[in-house]
UniProtKB/Swiss-Prot annotation:
It comes from Thermotoga maritima (strain ATCC 43589 / DSM 3109 / JCM 10099 / NBRC 100826 / MSB8). This is Histidinol dehydrogenase. The lineage of its organism: Bacteria, Thermotogati, Thermotogota, Thermotogae, Thermotogales. The gene is hisD. One of its GO terms (cellular component) is cytoplasm. Zn(2+) binds at Q254, H257, D358, H417. Belongs to the histidinol dehydrogenase family. The keyword NAD applies.
Length: 428
């Protein structure tokens, strides 16, 4: 664990750079995987399926059958819970819907902006170790609200080559039938470029580990992506009024996700700074073995506690980190809202642990990481739509404005543009 007493911006940025460098070590491998899947299709994909998946998957059983989906067995309570959460998520995401608009100018021209859903989207659902059905919900619900026609789901198989029944049942409830058992960079490449078996999509959304995050970064431009949603992050700003057990529990809630996850506590309390490491250790020991192992590595490498002399400085550091998740555990959690500039999602007060955001409080949990919250946002309905401009110029407006447009074209040096306008003026 890293302890920092009143660090400057350079020290904080150095810490963040170290984490990014640890991730970028696999970048060349990712590029090679993408290149080969793009050029060789199924042949390369099958090789990577056998090399990287926990259970070797052949091309012939890459896609999950409808029979497998319908036969997925889960508790009835799970089904009822998922249905409740879907409605809660829809209630929030419907408020994000953007409307087309059209209007007529004084001269009779018809102008507007048409909001159109994307035709196809690929959802990457992390898997293998645990069934991230919550991520499936967070990605699929806004896509459904937006009206996306084709939604493909890809998730790594477990050690038996199967997909978690919780994932399959969630797909069935959502009405999703196109499901692939593949993960990693090769899954991203297959959805981007297509293969003989996998049909390409227009956009890929969903978080993943290092390989997935870097793969999405490299295919962007050939396909749309949501954001750089990689290994999890949390920053907790506290003035010392919060219970140490709450802080420690929330710290580890992200550390258990991934060995490259980053948990940071920024506090104005010397007591928190000095005592929290021991409390975190106690909570760490209480975790199941596999989660404890992951959380310990993450905590040792990237777990950080920072002491500052004021809440103002605490939020300056938080804005510098631009965390995926930001918890505000202070006496009056609404008061500092004006200081928050960079964060994927903000959780206010002692009852709003980040975990409730993971499982359906309303806002999406697919969020920007690696400081990309400085310029991007969490997944939302508009990520699944595009805007198409509509123009119909009336004869009156053309007569009145065409000479101006013709002159502008010539000032820019585009004679053919000007002539396209002039030839119409000559025929009036």
């Amino acid at each position: 664990m890293i302890l920092m007493n009143n660090p400057g911006d350079k020290e904080v940025l150095r810490l963040l750079k170290q984490r990014m460098e640890s991730v970028s070590q696999v970048e060349e491998t990712v590029k090679e995987i993408i290149r080969r899947v793009k050029e060789e299709g199924d042949r390369a994909l099958e090789e990577f399926l056998k090399r990287f998946e926990k259970h070797p998957v052949g091309i012939e059983n890459l896609r999950v059958t409808e029979k497998e989906i319908s036969e997925a067995q889960v508790e009835e309570e799970f089904v009822e819970t998922i249905k409740i959460v879907i409605e809660d998520l829809k209630e929030f995401h419907r408020r994000q819907e953007e409307r087309s608009f059209f209007f007529t100018t004084k001269g009779g021209s018809f102008l507007g902006e048409m909001v159109v859903p994307l035709e196809s989207v690929g959802i990457y659902v992390p898997g293998g170790k645990v069934p991230y059905f919550s991520t499936l919900l967070m990605c699929a619900v806004p896509a459904i609200v937006a009206g996306v026609e084709r939604i493909a789901v890809t998730t790594p198989p477990n050690e038996n080559g199967g997909i978690s029944p919780y994932i399959l049942k969630t797909c069935e409830i959502l009405g999703l039938k196109e499901i692939y058992r593949m993960g990693g960079a090769h899954a991203v490449a297959a959805l981007t470029y297509g293969t003989e078996t996998v049909k390409p999509v227009d956009k890929i959304v969903g978080p993943g580990g290092v390989f997935v995050t870097l793969a999405k970064k490299h295919v962007y431009g050939d396909v749309g992506i949501d954001s750089i949603a990689g290994p999890s992050e949390i920053a907790i700003v506290t003035d010392g009024s919060a219970d140490l057990d709450l802080i420690a529990a929330d710290f580890l809630s992200q550390a258990e996700h991934d060995e490259n996850a980053m948990s940071v506590v920024i506090t104005t309390s010397k007591e928190v700074f000095e005592k929290l490491p021991q409390v975190i250790e106690r909570h760490l020991e209480a975790l199941p073995e596999e989660r404890r192992k992951t959380a310990r590595i993450s905590t040792e490498n990237f777990g950080t506690i920072i002491l500052t002399d004021s809440l103002k400085r605490a939020f300056e550091i938080s804005n510098l980190i631009a965390p995926e998740h930001l918890e505000v555990l202070v006496e009056n959690p609404f008061e500092p809202l004006g200081h928050i500039k960079n964060a994927g999602s903000v959780f206010l007060g002692k009852y709003t642990c980040e975990s409730v955001g993971d499982y359906g409080a309303g806002p999406n949990h697919v969020l920007p990481t690696f400081r990309s919250a400085r310029f991007s946002s969490g997944l939302r309905v508009s990520d699944f739509t595009k805007k198409i401009f509509i123009t119909h110029l009336s004869e009156e407006d053309f007569r009145r404005k065409s000479e101006l447009y013709s002159k502008m074209a010539r000032w820019e040096g585009f004679e053919a543009h000007a002539r396209a306008i002039d030839v119409r003026r000559e025929k009036l």
